[in-house]
C-alpha cells in the first residue's frame, strides 16, 4: 500500500509491502519491505499483476517490484510526459501519455513486466476506455473504436452511428461486442 508522510512542508511517499503468510509472521507488523526513494513524487496506485509482480504508478515513474518472499525493486521507468491513464493486461503495462507538445494529442506506450518497452503509438482521439485484448490494444470513445497491435500499428478503426457506452473483447481475436443505449451488437474485424 502507499503511505504519505508529511515532513515539514514536504510530502514523502512510502510503498510498504505486507506478507500475511508464514513468511510475514516473523516480521514486525508483517512488513516485509518498504521503499521510500520517491522523494516528492506521489504514488497514486499500486497494482498486483500476479502473485509475484506489483507495479507502483507515480506521477512520473512506474516501479516494477518482483516479490518472492520479500519484494525487490526490479525496474524503474522514468516517464517524461504527463501520465493520463494506466491500464494493465496479463503480460503488459500500458500508459496513455499527454503528447500535445509533439505531434498527436496522446501517446500510448506498452511495457512488459520486465520493464522493457514493447511498442508505442501516437493517436489524436480522446478515449473513454482502453484495454488489452491478448496481443492487441483496444480503445474507444462514444463515437469510435480503434485497435492497435503490439508493434504500435493501428490495425482497425470504426465509427459508430449511435453513441457507444462500451466495446468489450469476446476473447476471440477480432471479435467485439458493442453496447449502446438501444442494442448490443457483435463486431467482427476482417
Model-derived segments and spans:
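Structural motif
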Residues: 10-19, 60-65, 102-109, 144-148, ...
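Short, small-residue-biased leader/transition segments that mark boundaries at the very start
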Residues: 1-4
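Repeated scaffold domains used in trafficking and secretory/extracellular systems
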Residues: 34-49, 79-91, 122-135, 162-174
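A short beta-strand motif characteristic of beta-propeller blades
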Residues: 26-37, 71-78, 115-122, 153-159
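Eukaryotic tandem repeat interaction scaffolds
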Residues: 56-129
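Short loop/turn segments that connect beta-strands within beta-propeller blades
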Residues: 20-23, 67-70, 112-116, 149-153, ...
Amino acid at each position: 500500500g502507499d503511505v504519505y508522510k508529511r515532513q515539514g512542508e514536504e510530502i514523502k511517499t512510502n510503498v510498504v509491502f505486507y506478507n500475511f503468510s508464514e513468511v510475514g509472521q516473523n516480521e514486525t507488523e508483517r512488513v516485509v519491505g518498504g521503499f521510500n526513494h520517491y522523494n516528492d513524487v506521489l504514488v497514486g496506485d499500486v497494482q498486483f499483476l500476479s502473485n509475484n509482480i506489483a507495479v507502483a504508478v507515480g506521477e512520473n515513474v512506474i516501479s516494477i517490484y518482483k516479490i518472492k518472499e520479500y519484494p525487490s525493486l526490479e525496474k524503474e521507468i522514468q516517464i517524461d510526459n504527463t501520465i493520463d491513464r494506466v491500464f494493465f493486461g496479463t503480460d503488459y503495462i500500458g500508459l496513455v501519455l499527454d503528447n500535445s507538445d509533439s505531434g498527436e494529442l496522446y501517446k500510448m506506450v506498452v511495457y512488459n513486466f520486465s520493464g522493457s518497452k514493447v511498442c508505442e503509438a501516437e493517436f489524436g482521439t480522446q478515449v473513454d476506455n482502453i484495454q488489452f485484448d491478448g496481443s492487441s490494444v483496444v480503445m474507444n470513445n462514444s463515437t469510435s473504436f480503434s485497435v492497435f497491435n503490439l508493434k504500435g500499428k493501428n490495425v482497425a478503426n470504426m465509427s459508430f452511428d449511435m453513441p457507444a457506452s462500451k466495446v468489450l473483447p469476446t476473447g476471440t481475436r477480432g471479435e467485439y461486442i458493442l453496447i449502446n443505449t438501444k442494442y448490443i451488437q457483435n463486431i467482427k474485424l476482417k
